[in-house]
Regions:
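Conserved metal-phosphate-binding beta-hairpin within the catalytic cores
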Residues: 101, 181-200
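C-terminal helix-cap and adjacent tail motif
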Residues: 119, 202-253
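Short histidine-centered catalytic/ligand-binding loop motif
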Residues: 46-56, 139-162
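A long amphipathic alpha-helix within ATP-dependent nucleotide-binding catalytic cores
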Residues: 150-182
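A short glycine-rich, hydrophobically flanked beta-strand micro-motif that places a catalytic Asp/Glu
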Residues: 80-85, 174-190
Length: 253
């Protein structure tokens, strides 16, 4: 377990650059530094832009939520946040899966099934997508997932159970923030002991968040849909989410 780390751990080379973060190696092979970017993308990077302070905001929100999840028994890759837009994380091998948990119909679920946007689901829906930009991150059946050997059947069961636990916690937390958790995406990885850890981030980039007190279908949006759908005020929405998270954490402490 990585408990205590030197505050001035040196950063080495760039390991990987994704759409939202850059990962750097450090002088500890089991620790990476994640640098959160202000870049914004949508529709598998077909739409690109920038959201002022997004890196700082998403890193701050993710850090708070990872700490809360750890305190509730969910193992994550989070270690600490040495700077507002940086997070030290445990090195994991990311499973090529995007795990989407849905509480309310929206986005592709509504488009593909005809369920009206806003339909509350009788129980949370857990979906697995193939994390592959070239293929457009397709929805997987359980048989296809196993056929492609993206994870073992046992790992899939563990991940699904973790996803439902995380959803239950986050749904309650966002509710305390006056925010409805419509759906969200998670990624998981394997550490050096082959243990499954929650990885990536939890932020308005990866969650569909609606202002609970707002009924207007456009004004209620507090997530990356504001960027996707050109609704404007993206920075204000992200900042508002951060403020509510910090206020809720402060109240709970």
């Amino acid at each position: 377990m990585l408990k205590s780390l030197p505050p001035t751990m040196s950063v080495h080379s760039k390991l990987y650059e994704g759409k939202a973060k850059i990962l750097y190696t450090t002088d500890n092979p089991e620790v990476l530094l994640a640098d959160f970017k202000d870049d914004a993308t949508a529709f598998n990077a077909q739409k690109r832009g920038s959201i002022l302070d997004k890196g700082r905001i998403n890193c701050s929100i993710s850090s708070q939520l990872f700490k809360k999840l750890e305190a509730n028994g969910i193992r994550t890759h989070f270690i600490d946040s040495p700077a507002p837009n940086q997070m030290r994380v445990k090195a994991v091998k990311i499973l090529p899966l995007e795990v989407v948990i849905r509480n309310i119909a929206a986005g592709s679920l509504s488009q593909q099934t005809g369920l009206p946007v806003g339909t509350v689901l009788k129980q949370p829906l857990v979906e697995f997508y193939y994390k592959n930009d070239q293929l457009g991150d397709p929805l997987l059946t359980s048989d296809r997932l196993l056929l492609l050997e993206l994870a073992t059947a046992e790992q899939v069961d563990v991940i699904k159970n973790l996803a439902l636990q995380i959803n239950e916690f986050l749904r309650r937390f966002w509710q305390q923030c006056g925010i409805t958790l419509v759906d969200f995406k998670l990624e998981f990885g394997l550490d050096s002991q082959q243990q499954i850890l929650l990885a990536d981030e939890i932020s308005p980039d990866t969650c569909r968040l609606w202002d609970t007190a707002e009924t207007d279908p456009n004004r209620r949006v507090m997530d990356k849909d504001r960027f996707r759908r050109d609704l404007g005020n993206v920075e204000d929405a992200y900042q508002e989410v951060l403020q509510r998270v910090l206020q809720t954490v402060d109240t709970q402490n």
